[in-house]
């Protein structure tokens, strides 16, 4: 089957924003204008197409990033049809993992900001993730019809808070109730959308007289920004020559693709204004799969040889599984992005990460949670496969004759855990199954059994994250669970270096004995300097310990890292240097060296100034001015460090760093302090030494 849309006319984009910036409404309008949806879904009445899980419709927030395919030929039908694959991403900080996953497989992004609230803390988190994956992006300032809407203020915040270089592509005509349309700064015309047909048609008009001067000023800003794309254009511009519309667009596109500028558009999705022109900007300025660098990977040849795959149907098939979802009708759905080649339903592919073959039973293109079955997918496509057995988020699927492992995704460690138990014994097995399936869908969620208490523990990125997991168990798997008190994920570390720590395991009792003897140095690593949080250096000279026992020493120490000597929490940021020891020809064994290593580790850890680390959260509170003192006082009582505050239209924004252990139940307390008028966001920032009284209490509670 031949390709229907050339790959240069593909746009794989994410729509990303802070909660309540109106992102889901914006996506709904895109689906409406691209002709996919005939009735516009409103978030207010729980009918939005992209928010397809029941909880999302109830809570009005987007949890799972659904992938949807749409076609766009331009506001004035000026293009050949372009295929736009949209990945909707959640805006709540507990679901940052979903954003991270979608950023990994996108080519470009639209950042949606609220014209009143501007750049919010979650916007900054998403921005950092987009920077990490070098995703070219444009901005859409939404809600121009709301009280307090100010387009140019938000443009200023994109510069000051995100450190970006925003270039307005439009200006808003009026604001709040008086918002009527936008000025197109490339064409220097006003765009007026027809309210009678929900903005499907529009007219170009003259720029209002009272805006002429402002429009001219920002038009010059736009031209200057375009001219900076090349010396040739700059000379033309400085020589007083007019740049053509085509030259301007081409130059701006070049600068967006190299992440030098962020083009800013505006509108009101709710009032059907602006989304159409923003879609045109997606086509004009965001990359197709062939505009972004080839994806890197390593060959599965035992030597980890670097390799790459280009966005072409002629290269061997390679794809990345970026999301696993459970569908009530068909079971497991594996969402994947094809980077190169072609695959047909029925084909067998290789999961190169697990060295296992998988068969593509059926391939479906998703429109929110509606499915359309298709026979094949090609480079640049985003689709879902039904029937893959053992694929995890981040796995590579590829041609068995040309194996490659594409760059993996990195997932954050959970910071909060709770014990769960089924309300009835009969549900025990069902709960295990449900949690296993949910953990497969969401790599930032973990589940395990505590060996001492035999309880099932679940861990995640925040209270809301775990609430939703428990809620989904009930809804999707009919398992009611009792939930324990949240527990903090503490860590253990050392603060000084110790040398020549000896560990000896020797047993002589008739027959073959056991003998292992090691001497190690132990030292702290700079936090974050080693992704594993652990390094092992083998400095054995002259074979005093035979090479075959070295891995056993490493393993013995790694087993100790899982539950540290202080309070049984994982040990991080520690280095071990093995430099001496001895062995016995007959009595030495791997087990003996493992035990010797664990003895040395425990001994050394006690002497190396051990500390308990606690997770510190970055907390931002928005509160009415009159409650500022109470909110700050309460944060201080929670051992919070104030990092600054600023005045907003709606009150005061307070920045603080607070230990997670002090933040349980904060939502309720904040509500009562401010009569429900304040809101807050919280995200993991770093691990820091817990004060000695806190550490002592934690250690005693763990019975150490």
Swiss-Prot record:
UniProt-listed CDD domains: EF-G, EFG_III, EFG_mtEFG1_IV, EFG_mtEFG_C, EFG_mtEFG_II
tr-type G domain mapped to chain residues: 8-290
Example GO BP: ribosome disassembly
Gene3D superfamilies: 3.30.230.10, 3.30.70.240, Elongation Factor G (Translational Gtpase), domain 3, P-loop containing nucleotide triphosphate hydrolases, Translation factors
InterPro entries recorded: EFG_II, EFG_III, EFG_III/V, EFG_IV, EFG_V, EFG_V-like, EFTu-like_2, G_TR_CS
One Pfam family cited in the UniProt record for this chain: EFG_IV
Disulfide bridge map: none
GO MF assignments: GTP binding; GTPase activity; guanosine tetraphosphate binding; translation elongation factor activity
Annotated HAMAP family: EF_G_EF_2_B (MF_00054_B)
Role description: Catalyzes the GTP-dependent ribosomal translocation step during translation elongation. During this step, the ribosome changes from the pre-translocational (PRE) to the post-translocational (POST) state as the newly formed A-site-bound peptidyl-tRNA and P-site-bound deacylated tRNA move to the P and E sites, respectively. Catalyzes the coordinated movement of the two tRNA molecules, the mRNA and conformational changes in the ribosome.
Family according to the record: Belongs to the TRAFAC class translation factor GTPase superfamily. Classic translation factor GTPase family. EF-G/EF-2 subfamily.
Official protein name in the record: Elongation factor G
Organism: Citrobacter koseri (strain ATCC BAA-895 / CDC 4225-83 / SGSC4696)
């Amino acid at each position: 089957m031949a390709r229907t849309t050339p790959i240069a006319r593909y746009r794989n984009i994410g729509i990303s924003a802070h909660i309540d910036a109106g992102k889901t409404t914006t996506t709904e309008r895109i689906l409406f204008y691209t002709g996919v949806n005939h009735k516009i879904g409103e978030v207010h009445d729980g009918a939005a197409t992209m928010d397809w899980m029941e909880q999302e419709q109830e809570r009005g927030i987007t949890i799972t990033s659904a992938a949807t395919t749409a076609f766009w030929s331009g506001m004035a039908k000026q293009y050949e049809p372009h295929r736009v694959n949209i990945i909707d991403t959640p805006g709540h900080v507990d679901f940052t993992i979903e954003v991270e996953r979608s950023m990994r497989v996108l080519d470009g992004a639209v950042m949606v900001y609220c014209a009143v609230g501007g750049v919010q803390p979650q916007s900054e988190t998403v921005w950092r993730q987009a920077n990490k994956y070098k995703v070219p992006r444009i901005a859409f300032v939404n809600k121009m019809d709301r009280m307090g809407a100010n387009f140019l203020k938000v443009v200023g915040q994109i510069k000051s808070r995100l450190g970006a270089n925003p270039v307005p592509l439009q200006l808003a005509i009026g604001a709040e109730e008086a918002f009527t349309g936008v000025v197109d700064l490339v064409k220097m015309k006003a765009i007026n959308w027809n309210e009678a047909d929900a903005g499907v048609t529009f007219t170009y008009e003259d720029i209002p007289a009272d805006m002429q001067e402002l429009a001219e000023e920002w038009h010059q800003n736009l031209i200057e920004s375009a001219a900076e794309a090349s010396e040739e254009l700059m000379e033309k511009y400085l020589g007083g020559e007019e740049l053509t519309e085509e030259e301007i667009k081409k130059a701006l596109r070049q600068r967006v693709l190299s992440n030098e500028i962020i083009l800013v558009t505006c509108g009101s999705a709710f009032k059907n204004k602006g989304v159409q022109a923003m879609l045109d900007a997606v086509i004009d300025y965001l990359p197709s799969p062939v505009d972004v660098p080839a994806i890197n990977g390593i060959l599965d040849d035992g030597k980890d040889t670097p390799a790459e795959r280009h966005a072409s149907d002629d290269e061997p098939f390679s794809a990345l599984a970026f999301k696993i979802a459970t569908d009530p009708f068909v079971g497991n759905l594996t969402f994947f992005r094809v980077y190169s080649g072609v695959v047909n339903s029925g084909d067998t592919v290789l999961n190169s990460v697990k060295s296992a073959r998988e068969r593509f039973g059926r391939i479906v293109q998703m429109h929110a949670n509606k499915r359309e079955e298709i026979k094949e997918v090609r480079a640049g496509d985003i689709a879902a496969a039904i029937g893959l057995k053992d694929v995890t988020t981040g796995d590579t699927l590829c041609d068995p004759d040309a194996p490659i492992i594409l760059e993996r995704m990195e997932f954050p460690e959970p910071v909060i855990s709770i014990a769960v138990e089924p309300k009835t014994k009969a549900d025990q097995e069902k709960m295990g199954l449900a949690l296993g399936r949910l953990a497969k869908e969401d790599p930032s969620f973990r589940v395990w059994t505590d060996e001492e208490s035999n309880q099932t523990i679940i861990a995640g990125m925040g209270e809301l994250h775990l609430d939703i997991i428990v809620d989904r168990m009930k809804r999707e798997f009919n398992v009611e669970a009792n939930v324990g008190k949240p527990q903090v994920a503490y860590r253990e570390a050392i603060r000084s270096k110790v040398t020549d720590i000896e560990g000896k395991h020797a047993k002589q009792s008739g027959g073959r004995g056991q003998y292992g003897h090691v001497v190690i140095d132990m030292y702290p690593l700079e936090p974050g300097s080693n992704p594993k949080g652990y390094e092992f250096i083998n400095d054995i000279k002259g074979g005093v310990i035979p090479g075959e026992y070295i891995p056993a020493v490493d393993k013995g120490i790694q087993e100790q890292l899982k539950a540290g000597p202080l309070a049984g929490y994982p040990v991080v940021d520690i280095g071990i240097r093995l430099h001496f020891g001895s062995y016995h020809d007959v009595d030495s064994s791997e087990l003996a060296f493992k035990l010797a290593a664990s003895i040395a580790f425990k001994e050394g850890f006690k002497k190396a100034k051990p500390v308990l680390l606690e997770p510190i959260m970055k907390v931002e509170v928005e509160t009415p001015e009159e409650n500022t003192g109470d909110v700050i006082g309460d944060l201080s009582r929670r051992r919070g460090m104030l990092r600054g505050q600023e005045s907003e239209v709606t009150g005061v924004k307070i920045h603080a760093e607070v230990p997670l252990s002090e933040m349980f139940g904060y939502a309720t307390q904040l509500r009562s302090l401010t009569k429900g008028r304040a809101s807050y966001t919280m995200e993991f920032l770093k691990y820091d030494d817990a004060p000695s009284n806190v550490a002592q209490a934690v250690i005693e509670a763990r019975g150490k």
